[in-house]
Amino acid sequence: MAGKSSLFKVILLGDGGVGKSSLMNRYVTNKFDTQLFHTIGVEFLNKDLEVDGHFVTMQIWDTAGQERFRSLRTPFYRGSDCCLLTFSVDDSQSFQNLSNWKKEFIYYADVKEPESFPFVILGNKIDISERQVSTEEAQAWCRDNGDYPYFETSAKDATNVAAAFEEAVRRVLATEDRSDHLIQTDTVSLHRKPKPSSSCC
């Protein structure tokens, strides 16, 4: 892409095992790996795209969902432009924990205006037939907690994955002053963002 692009930092949060790494890899590489291990700490991948005429470099951060990795993941919340809160539709506990993930992010990211911060909610693993969280339950949570957009996704068959990430970009574009994010696309520098201290597939 020629000219100027916007660099957006998007972070995936949610319980371990809900498919955050698979969603990131499906979107960036269009691949699904059944052998992915739980993330240790954080890792990120970049994706260049055009949304509604805007050229964007999306820096997608995947975080470890296990409680014991909290000290590793929370320093990387700062500077995020959007947060994708993720649960698995076949795991009701991961859905119930969304509020805790939201609170953790707002606190450690030092979000100044939580009411207007762009969150997108993902209900992953809809390819699994036996689900514990209904579409209506998830939609009601989104309405009650900030009228957030909700996508039911499957990293396995790519259902709604691209649509969810593109909506995240739209939400950022609608709320952010893009002048703070402009970069030259032919010399993309990520030095202003922290690098992961530890990562795993």
Swiss-Prot record:
The gene is RAB9A. A lipid is attached at residues 200-201 (S-geranylgeranyl cysteine). Belongs to the small GTPase superfamily. Rab family. It is a lipid-anchor. A motif (Switch 1) lies at residues 31-42. GTP binds at residues 17-22, 34, 38-39, 65, 124-125, 127, 156. The small GTPases Rab are key regulators of intracellular membrane trafficking, from the formation of transport vesicles to their fusion with membranes. Rabs cycle between an inactive GDP-bound form and an active GTP-bound form that is able to recruit to membranes different sets of downstream effectors directly responsible for vesicle formation, movement, tethering and fusion. RAB9A is involved in the transport of proteins between the endosomes and the trans-Golgi network (TGN). Its EC number is 3.6.5.2. It comes from the Eukaryota. GO terms for biological process: positive regulation of exocytosis; protein transport; Rab protein signal transduction; receptor-mediated endocytosis; regulation of protein localization; retrograde transport, endosome to Golgi. This is Ras-related protein Rab-9A. Interacts (preferentially in its GTP-bound form) with GCC2 (via its GRIP domain). Interacts (GTP-bound form) with SGSM1; the GDP-bound form has much lower affinity for SGSM1. Interacts with SGSM2. The GTP-bound form but not the GDP-bound form interacts with HPS4 and the BLOC-3 complex (heterodimer of HPS1 and HPS4) but does not interact with HPS1 alone. Interacts (GTP-bound form) with NDE1; two RAB9A-GTP molecules lie on the opposite sides of the NDE1 homodimer; the interaction leads to RAB9A-dynein motor tethering. Interacts (GTP-bound form) with NDEL1. It comes from Canis lupus familiaris (Dog).
